[in-house]
């Protein structure tokens, strides 16, 4: 439809879809109020939407949330952010799903590692997984049947070093 009023909103580098949705809801309420007031005063002119710039998103299925570690760290990080909170990005480990709630981009990599390999899995250092172009740190995760938790805490009593996430 036609556009009456627009506002821009920056997306933060580590912001999840859920966090962005909350900020958009607050902004949307303000913009709606402003739009109705300005429309009532006759201050707005409808501008036709450019159909070439309009985009559509298909239905997001659970399988869309599966992480492919042969992709770049940035692509994986953005997938995790975009799938949080629902349906939640995941990978498989030992035939079981592992929900990955948050990640952090790393500046260094491990060229000898294979994609999906848990290169560092230490309760003090964290969980670092090999990607197509380096490493990504998993900072918050959830094993099947367990609660969502900080990755370092989740690694207590678990030895994932050398394991593969698929």
Outline where the language-model segments fall.
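Active-site-proximal loop/hinge segments within enzyme catalytic domains
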Residues: 1-106
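An anion-binding loop in the catalytic cleft
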Residues: 64, 69-166
């Amino acid at each position: 439809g036609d556009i009456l009023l627009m506002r821009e909103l920056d997306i933060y580098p580590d912001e999840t879809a859920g966090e962005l949705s909350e900020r958009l809801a607050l902004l949307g309420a303000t913009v709606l109020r402003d739009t109705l007031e300005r429309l009532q005063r006759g201050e707005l002119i409808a501008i036709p939407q450019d159909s070439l710039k309009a985009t559509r998103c298909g239905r997001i299925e659970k399988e869309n949330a599966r992480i492919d570690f042969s992709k770049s760290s940035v692509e994986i990080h953005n997938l995790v952010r975009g799938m949080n909170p629902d349906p939640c990005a995941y990978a498989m480990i030992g035939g079981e799903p592992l929900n990955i709630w948050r990640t952090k981009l790393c500046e260094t990599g491990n060229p000898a590692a294979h994609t999906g390999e848990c290169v560092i899995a230490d309760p003090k250092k964290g969980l670092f997984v090999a990607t197509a172009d380096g490493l990504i740190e998993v900072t918050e995760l959830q094993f099947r049947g367990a609660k969502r938790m900080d990755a370092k805490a989740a690694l207590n009593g678990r030895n994932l070093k050398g394991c593969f996430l698929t």
